[in-house]
């Protein structure tokens, strides 16, 4: 398969909520950003329900989230995609990666990894120390014996080494040749060169991650058999033709990893079920990562904070326009959080105000910019 990778033309954005509970203000803020990014250019917006992690799924949460989005005035095109219905596609993707020789079994428990690694400040991303990669390199017979014995294991994807990397590649394949072939300036501001993933984020400007040192070999199939988030979102975005991704800045590092997975999939012959036939598939999507929204204590908003979820706010008779107006203010699209509709923001939408001021924000009841309805919800 030959793919032409270009920029320009219509784009496809997506909502990708996890049905683990009711949406809160922080979720709506991200959803509004994604919707405006696509709709301001007259482009497609799709819906994906990320329900692959079955233990986290709350029954009925998907319908509540879609109802809340309709109530807010945030629409999408076509029918929703459900990850729970796509196991065959993920199995196929796994085989494409396996053909590239970039996968290996990992027998480490979470406790083992926590003991050997330290999370990165800011996003909590934990770089795997490569224990089982070294085991495969130094003692392949032991690995084979453990697999035959049926020892529980996850599957990891190996990262390419940077030019400065000193670790020996332990997965016997030629996939290192996948990286570094095309300079970033020829890849639409995004690419992987000498084991370094580069992309020009529309909010946080150019980003560079050494995949081996700053990302590390990552799980794409868990020990319990469930497919990993990092794999399924790449497969889904390829199949949906998504090339406009908006999400929180805590996923900046994950973007580098997903670029590598995407590149390996396409090199392994992955054939996307792309519904967007108006232009050829982009090699890498465009990205906008948003500042995080914290609670008054400085911790990131979570769905367990029920006073700020959509059910609680709607029960307080807060209007859609009040919520959208506040989220527009969080996106730096208006100087004060005055009520408005999503459509009111389309004509003047730009990432430039947020790019110029992308500090995280905390929701505080005593802040003079906090509207009364939100101050009351914050207690």
From Swiss-Prot:
L-glutamate binds at residues 14-18, 50, 229, 247. Binds 1 zinc ion per subunit. A motif ('KMSKS' region) lies at residues 300-304. Zn(2+) binds at residues 106, 108, 128, 132. A motif ('HIGH' region) lies at residues 17-27. Keywords: Aminoacyl-tRNA synthetase, ATP-binding, Ligase, Metal-binding, Nucleotide-binding, Zinc. Its cofactor is Zn(2+). ATP binds at residue 303. GO terms for cellular component: cytosol. Its EC number is 6.1.1.-. GO terms for molecular function: ATP binding; glutamate-tRNA ligase activity; metal ion binding. Residues 161-188 are annotated as: Disordered. GO terms for biological process: glutamyl-tRNA aminoacylation. PANTHER family: GLUTAMATE--TRNA LIGASE, GLUTAMYL-Q TRNA(ASP) SYNTHETASE. Catalyzes the tRNA-independent activation of glutamate in presence of ATP and the subsequent transfer of glutamate onto a tRNA(Asp). Glutamate is transferred on the 2-amino-5-(4,5-dihydroxy-2-cyclopenten-1-yl) moiety of the queuosine in the wobble position of the QUC anticodon. Belongs to the class-I aminoacyl-tRNA synthetase family. GluQ subfamily. This is Glutamyl-Q tRNA(Asp) synthetase. The lineage of its organism: Bacteria, Bacillati, Actinomycetota, Actinomycetes, Bifidobacteriales.
